[in-house]
Regions:
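Structural motif
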Residues: 33-35
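Active-site cores of enzymes that catalyze phosphoryl transfer or operate on phosphate-rich substrates
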Residues: 16, 22-31
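Short acidic-glycine loop/turn motifs at beta-strand connectors
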Residues: 28, 38-42
C-alpha cells in the first residue's frame, strides 16, 4: 500500500505546500544519518532528502560536517531558499559528542533528544544535563528532550495509512 502511494517529486526541492523545514539526525559509530522534512498546513509533510555523513563520530571533522549540513538552504518550488528551522539529534549514542554539538549551535536551533518507550507524551519537557563544579544545573547548558517513541511511531503509522481525499486534497497529517 505504501509503495502505491509513492509520488514523483524532486529530492532537495521543497514543494509548494512546504512552509518550513526541520531535520532529524541519528548518530552511529561510523556515520550520522539525517532527514530533512518540509512541513505544511495541517501537519502535511514531505521528505525533502535523506543524507548520510560518513566517518568516525568520535572525530571532530564529522561534527563540523554536520554543522555545515545544518546550515544548508533548500530551494522552494517558488524559488525562495529555506533554512532548516529546527534540528533534533538523538543522544542515545555518542551522548557527550551530541551535547557538545548542541551547545555550539544557535539558541533554540538544535535539540538533543532521547527516545523512551515509557513516554506518555510525544515530546517531554527539556531536562538540563550540564552541571557546574558544585553540581548545580547550568541555566544555559545543554538540555535533552525525552521523546515518546511508541506514541510517535503509532502516530506516524496512522499518518502513513492516510489516503488522498476524493477532491484531490490531502487530510491532516498526510505524509508525501
Amino acid at each position: 500500500v505504501l509503495f502505491d502511494k509513492r509520488e514523483d517529486y524532486r529530492q532537495e526541492l521543497v514543494p509548494s505546500g512546504g512552509l518550513f523545514l526541520t531535520a532529524g539526525a541519528d548518530v552511529q559509530k561510523d556515520r550520522i544519518e539525517c532527514e530533512v522534512v518540509a512541513w505544511g498546513r495541517n501537519r502535511e509533510s514531505w521528505s525533502v532528502g535523506y543524507f548520510i555523513i560518513n566517518g568516525d563520530t568520535a572525530r571532530e571533522d564529522v561534527w563540523n560536517e554536520l554543522t555545515d549540513f545544518s546550515r544548508r538552504y533548500f530551494e522552494h518550488s517558488s524559488g525562495a531558499m529555506l533554512p532548516i528551522s529546527r534540528f533534533a539529534i538523538d543522544s542515545g549514542f555518542a551522548t557527550q559528542q551530541v551535547y557538545n554539538w548542541v551547545r555550539k549551535q544557535p539558541l533554540n536551533f538544535a535539540m538533543a533528544i532521547k527516545g523512551t518507550d515509557s513516554g506518555v507524551t510525544p515530546l517531554g519537557l527539556p531536562t538540563k544535563v550540564d552541571l557546574n563544579i558544585n553540581g548545580k544545573k547550568l541555566r544555559r547548558g545543554a538540555k535533552v528532550w525525552t521523546v515518546g517513541t511508541s506514541i510517535l511511531k503509532s502516530e506516524l503509522y496512522q499518518f502513513l495509512r492516510l489516503t488522498q481525499n476524493e477532491d484531490e486534497s490531502f487530510p491532516a497529517g498526510y505524509c508525501h
